[in-house]
Amino acid sequence: MTKRIVLMIISMLALGILIAHLAASPAPHHAYFDQFSPEQYPLVIAHAGSELYPTDTLYALEQYAAMDVDVLEMDVHMTADGEIVLIHDDTVDRTTDGSGDVREMTLAEVQALDAGWYWTQDDQDYPFRGQGITIPTLREGFETFPDYAMIIEIKQEKPSMAAPLCDLIREYGMEEKALIPSFNDESIQEFRAACPEVATAAGHDEVQDFVIRGFLLLGGTISLEFEALQVPEKDNGIPIVTRLFLWFAHNRNVQVHIWTINEPDEMERFIDMGVDGIMTDRTDLLREILGR
């Protein structure tokens, strides 16, 4: 009798959790996603460009735009004189012929460097050296691609670039064109406070919380402050992007963008699973698979 009561209690709790999850309010729809038609899904998201072109450069973005990708992804830091520039790392060492911390350099110093210097596919030829490729400003990105959907990842943690980034987005009327992610939870919270009208992706801790609560069927208890989850397939060997994860996210009206997928068989697998976007260095392969 006791065992039966325990089982009944467990069943009722499980049912209650499931009902709470199903009844949970979805995230409000954001106008950022209105720029995509149903036929565009999954979105072809051009990862900053390291495999085919010099990363985070206007040259790379121009090549991807010519391929008619759906979204241009880029990374941003801020210079010592307050200019927001496209670059992945904290320093210029890995991608240019210079050295130094971006936040300690002026825009003039940053843009004097060759951003095509270290790009190579075979460690022998460096075809972009001396071609006039520089580190661009985000302002240049907005002026060059005013009608393109963008994902602008905040890489710099300190000093905060939330307010300057928000000001620039508003200046160019990109509030419904830009989606802002950051691995750093403090950075993304600062941006949301400064720019509540712009769509954001979940920070690292928010992703972990969503995964854990979803696994425990408590996904409906999360108060959502984000419109998208941008995640790898696994984190520390633990699967993240599963069909159940996608169901939880879509049930809350949250899109799932997976990164960084460059192999055709993996692309096909995630297309079949129903992800909303695939971030890739090989947009050419993904577009071919999608028949575009």
What are these regions (language model features)?
Residues 38-71:
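Short extracytoplasmic
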Residues 60-78, 144, 222-226:
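Catalytic domains of carbohydrate-active enzymes, especially glycoside hydrolases
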Residues 189, 263-276:
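Catalytic cores of alpha/beta
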Residues 5, 10-16, 20-33, 40-41, ...:
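Metal-dependent phosphodiesterase/phospholipase catalytic core, i.e.
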